[in-house]
Each structure stands twice: as structure tokens, then as C-alpha cells.
């Protein structure tokens, strides 16, 4: 989609100074079921590629290139069927299909920098995404089921000719980071955590997180946690500028959370030390954000170490290792800012039993399982 603007099952090859699309024309059977379609040649010419060959010709083409000593560059395959094709074409077993680093870095160098036209598309996707979240806030009430709220959000996407950019998270059990179950009945006092986005026909994606009180207003306890999470978000946005490593913004958001939770009696000690040691991850076990574009986690299949770390190794520390973007921000980058505060019973129990970070976590933290998760 990025390299030749096509969604159809075709293969694009660049060989020195020429570009070729390998694919097959539709048969009458295809036309009966799919209707009249542009020919392969017409679709190729729309994106400036004039040479086309049948898909069956790709194997001999690649084999000849290898025999001539040419290096065949390819991106890491994301789908299982592509792994099988690469094994058929190049004889590389799926376990060894790591992709070509120079090709990966070249694509990342292109796609990390969004053009004005791309940014306009992402803004449209984010506008629809925001409307989806607002609709959830409008319709939610005790007695509804989660799937009823999700249906209203989906309707907003469909009414704007959009698909979902990823499977919607919409749940009263927000302590589970990736919870796609929507069968719970919403009760008075519940918080409804949403992580959802819209995808435009062009392929560009939106992604936002929000937390909605079922009763339309927060309880005092919920509001206290919300204010900390909101401060994490606002301080992170305020810190954004070209040149600042996004990992520094992550650390800032974590320090803001630690200071806030100290005010609630849940954490103690020096915030810088707590974040450096990783104590904050009891309540903040995920990253702050990621690149956005044609993928909601843009270029996820190319590897975070290249997209978000420019080849540098990632941290292995719990919480910090989930940060997808660490490199200095540059003009043209588009990324999310999604801090959260989570109270995960199983994680809290494990840390309590192991007496982890007692210099930073008050024992009272382990009795506050009723505190709300806010993202």
C-alpha cells in the first residue's frame, strides 16, 4: 500500500532502474462476483509503474537475479501466507525470514516523516475517532451492555465511511490492557475504558484512549486518579518539541504519576529514583505512545528497534520495555500520547508477595484494589 498504493494481492519489485508489478488479470469468474474492475496495467499506470508481468513469473525472475549475484531485499513478512511465498520464491525458511535491514531502514526513513497530505488524512481519522469516543460518552448508562456502546461507536465509524483501525477495547474491566470482550453489563459506579480508532479508505488510522464514568460523573476517588492521569497527558504534550527523545517524555509522564500517587499515599520516595528503578510500572506497565500512519502502530511489522529506536537496543525493564517510541522527535513525526494508571490485582499481589520496591511503594497500595484504572 505504501510503496505502490495498491491493496490488491500483487507484488512490486524494483530492479536497478526499473519497477515491475507482478499480478494477474481478473478472469470472468472474478468479474461475475466482483464486477468490472480496472485492469492490472491500468492500476499500475495510476501509480507510475508501466511494466507488469504475470504472478507466476516472479519465481524465475528472482532465481535469475540470485544467479547473477544480485541481493534480493525484502521486508519482514507480517502474514503467514507471505512467509510461505518467500520460502517458495527464495528458499528461506520462515524462522529465518528477518528481512533486509537496509530495505527496512529505507522504508522507515520514508514513512516516519509524514507529508502535509498524510497529516491531513491522519487528522481526519482522528476526528472520526474522537467522535466515536464522544458518542460512547453520550450513550453510556448503567444497565447497558458493553457491546451496545461498541455498536454506537461502530456506527459513527461506518457513517463516516471508515473501518476500525484495530479491534476495539471497550470494557468495565480496564485493568486488562488488551480486553476485547464486550459482554459485561455496565453497572452504576463503573468506569468504561475505551481504546479505539477509525481507519479512512486511504488507509490512514486514528487511535485514542479515554475513560468514561457510567454515571456521567466521577466519584471522588475516581476523580483523584483521573486528575493524575490528565496531568500526565498534559505535561507530556507540553514537553513535545523537535529534538526531545520520546523516552524522556515517557519518563516525565511516569514522574508526574509518581508524584500524584504520593499525594494519594500509594507511593513514596524520590520520583526520579522510583522511575529509574522501575517502581512506577506497578501502576504504569505500558508505554506512552507509538508512531501512527497507514498502520495504527505504524510499521509494527518492520520492528520497533528500527521504527522507534533507530537500531538501538530496547530496555528489558518491566514497563519501560513496552515503550514503542524512544528516538528524538522530528518534524513530520505523528505519534500518540496515551498515558494510563492501572490497578491490576494479579500484578499487585505478585509485587506484594515479592516485597518489590518497598522504598517507593507504600504497603497501603496493596489494599487499594478498588481504585479505578484510567487511560
Regions found by a protein language model. Give the residues of each.
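Short beta-strand segments
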Residues: 22-24, 74-76, 171, 195, ...
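Charged, cofactor-coupling segments
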Residues: 187, 191-234, 294-371, 375
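Flexible, acidic/His-enriched mid-domain "rim/lid" segments that flank
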Residues: 53-165, 173-179, 201, 214-217
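Short acidic, glycine/serine/threonine-rich loops at helix termini
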Residues: 33-35, 84-87, 180-183, 204-208, ...
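Single conserved hydrophobic/aromatic residue that forms the stacking wall/gate
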Residues: 2-9, 13, 368, 373-375
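Compact, glycine/acidic-enriched structural inserts
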Residues: 23-56
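Short acidic-glycine loop/turn motifs at beta-strand connectors
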Residues: 14-17, 173
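Active-site cores enriched in adjacent His and Asp/Glu residues with nearby glycine-rich loops
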Residues: 120-190, 196, 200-203, 238-306, ...
